[in-house]
Amino acid sequence: MSVTAAKGFRAAGIAAGIKENGNPDLALVVNDGPSRAAAGVFTSNRVKAAPVLWSEQVLKGGEVTAVVLNSGGANACTGPKGFQDTHATAEKAAEVLGHSAGEVAVASTGLIGVLLPMDKLLPGIGQAAAELSEHGGEKAAIAIKTTDTVHKTAVAQGEAGWTVGGMAKGAGMLAPGLATMLVVLTTDADVDAATLDKALREATRVTFDRADSDGCMSTNDTVLLLASAASGVAPGYQEFAEAVRTVCADLARQLIGDAEGASKDIRIEVVNAATEDEAVDVGRTIARSNLLKCAIHGEDPNWGRVLSAIGTTSAAFEPDRLNVAINGVWVCRGGSVGDDRDLVDMRFREVVITADLAAGDASAVIWTNDLTADYVHENSAYSS
């Protein structure tokens, strides 16, 4: 599993001392080639962390040899010194690996507004390089965790023997675009940078961009896709894009399943919308209703809160034609009372809300979670 499932990649995860608790906090992923094609998508937040600004520039070259990822500090809103530290991180990785700093992407996650302890991070890169292994993917995934309770990995296999693997972190600040998350995807398929970019953007649009835990957009979101071509197989575009989408969907689902304080995973299906964009807008608006999220936490099938959220959007619909189902029970029909709400079984982890707009044939799925006291507690004490 993870980033070393594909041939041509090595990874490591270590405790460099960035986190005060001594947990793993530094990961290194290296592409040994023969190709080093790469693509990336980043946060749409206008306040971008230093590693995002750096990696955006690196990706313009279409090649990435290595990725350095740290948890325990976001290196966001840290001024010129923060960018200098990111540059120094890439330079150190390039030095120990024998490559160019211009091919080293950097990603960070953690508290905003705090400079990284470079006296620990830079030596840690050398230590991580010494521990690089074709079996190091799981350790790398563990090292990028922040408030995550579990590490997240996924893999998909192509029929001709090529692979797409990946790792992700994220538990809070999960909201489009991208959803806080760091993701590294790897493939040993022989795919050029332009094709990687197309497949990655198509995949993130319908996966990570549709995970919306708490409506808060990170400064550090980074999703990278690296190709080694080590399998020697050049798959057709559709097969390759489907594999990338499968891995992204798996990881996005894991992100929601590990959202901070969550006890329910909520799948919001918007159907019969006039356009896909309107379906996404409605789904996202429902996902951001704190009233609804609290109701789901209390296992209350309060369909009125769904209709109330829909009504705030600009989507095309007639109020007296709206239908809402919760876990398969149509509790609202024609904009009014539907089937007996007591028939709704909400005892299980997953809750499915279906909103039928009766305005067309477009649809979309958005994932979110409930709002709990644990979420409030965790985020009220995050920096203390």
Q: Regions from the language model: what does each represent?
A:
Residues 1-85, 94-384:
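A structural signal for small-residue-enriched, beta-sheet-centric alpha/beta enzyme cores
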